[in-house]
Amino acid sequence: MTYYGGKELGAAFRTVRKNTIQIAEDIPENKYDFKPAPDTRSVGQTLVHIALSSGFQHHVHSNKINDLKVVNFPELMEKIGSEEAKPRDKAQIIAMLKSDGGKFASYLESLSESFLAEQVMMPPGAEPATKSRFEMLLSPKEHEMHHRAQLMTFERMIGVVPHLTRERQARMAQAQPAQR
């Protein structure tokens, strides 16, 4: 028995996605084109990238691929890249975050411990040579958290206090003893 299975993976992913959606809602639509530097993704592009980023892992594991050398990486990356490039407004991006996130979380919740324990061969030359499906399926959450940290920095740059900071500030204010 493990302490962290499919249900826990799904719940953790839902929590991370909920926070990403809150950031997407907090940033004004007229700031979705904001880029902190010319050669980086904009707010909107980063959110779309997040929404689509679980697609690779979903493809690998829902198709029960056990050796990544059979994956046509150029074709898959081209497909994801063309989907990322489609223009979308704020409402469409938030809807995509909700829909794709919900589908992936539900998929995670359906997975058995035995499936999560299966080993998948990495591409030739990769270290380690194999990874468990469990480890691989953690990566979309980790990847999203990486980009969410970027988005929270973007928020500060455009004058928005991140929601987690606002919540912490509210808790701290409530904890202060009443002033006389």
Please describe what each predicted stretch is.
Residues T2, E78, K98-S99, R156:
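Generic detector of intrinsically disordered, low-complexity, polar/charged segments
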Residues M1-A11:
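Extreme N-terminal tail/first-helix region
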Residues K79-M121, T130-H146:
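Acidic/histidine-rich alpha-helical segments that form the ligand environment
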Residues G10-R14, I21, D33-K79, Q119-R180:
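Short, contiguous alpha-helical
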Residues T15, I27, P38, L111:
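Residue-level signal for short amphipathic helical patches enriched in basic/charged
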Residues P28, Q57-I65, L108, S112-F115:
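Membrane-helix exit/interface motif
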